[in-house]
Amino acid sequence: VHFLSLQIFGCGAVAQVTTSYDTKGQFLSINLAFAIGITFGVHIAHGISGAHLNPAVSLAFCLIGRFQWSKLPFYVLSQIIGAYLGAATVFAQYYDAIMSYGGGNLTVTGPTATAYIFATYPAAYLTTANGFVDQVVGTGALLLCLMALVDTRNSPAPKGLEPALVGTIVLVIGIAMGSNCGYAINPARDLGPRLFTYTAGWGLDVFTAGNYWCWVPLVAPLVGAILGCIIYLLFIEIHHSRKEDEKQTNERGNTEYDIDLDEWKPNKRNLTTLTASDKVHIINNPFQEGQSENSDWKKSSCNEECIVNRF
């Protein structure tokens, strides 16, 4: 459902602009449609999948230990299928317009090409190497910004505004980096529609066009996503100072607390900040070290067991 929203809005905008000969929208309207589609896609899917719409993001989060490897194949498959179905929906909606624009032909290149409505293709001047760099930079920028949005120690996104901010990231990437090859920055967003165009009648040209361009939007975003995560971890995240009762957000949006039982002063105010969906990581545990005479804990009506059992 979430990927359908992205493809229908984004590719639908490209179809409208293309088949109307730019009389019903321009490049900016395409960028806005993809950005708003991403916004609602994230909003729709956040509670179910953590809003994983992009295999590059999912893979990068697996590599840094913030997503489960066992889930990755199923997420990627669903993302590609969703993109395929989204492209099919746009084709069905704009079938007459596409056939009229192409003179009854489904072509990949030339003045009446329509394959780029669904998948990305390089500009005539773009080399494969330059296109690869373009996609690495664009996806790296995406991950760098996403990492900041979910970093609870670095002014994280206000609760409820995450979808809009993710959409804003996509918008600015499109405005700044969209002219070379359509800023796929997402392997599924390109592969799903490309597979659809192949099965719908555009033929093998969808894979061979642009000097076999099809592999670039599959591989380059993966490289860019990994680099974006590494850059954020090395230059930002590892420099955060760890604070008592530090909050960290896990993949489902719940809150995790690191509590040093040897130093933390339990009181009613502290305990009421914890909710049933939160998790506690016990560190420097005096109970396990035989230091159960800790006066602060003896005076408290709660101990380690009551905290752990609550969660």
Where are the regions that the model predicts?
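Membrane-interface helix-loop junctions and terminal tails of multi-pass membrane proteins
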Residues: 1-311
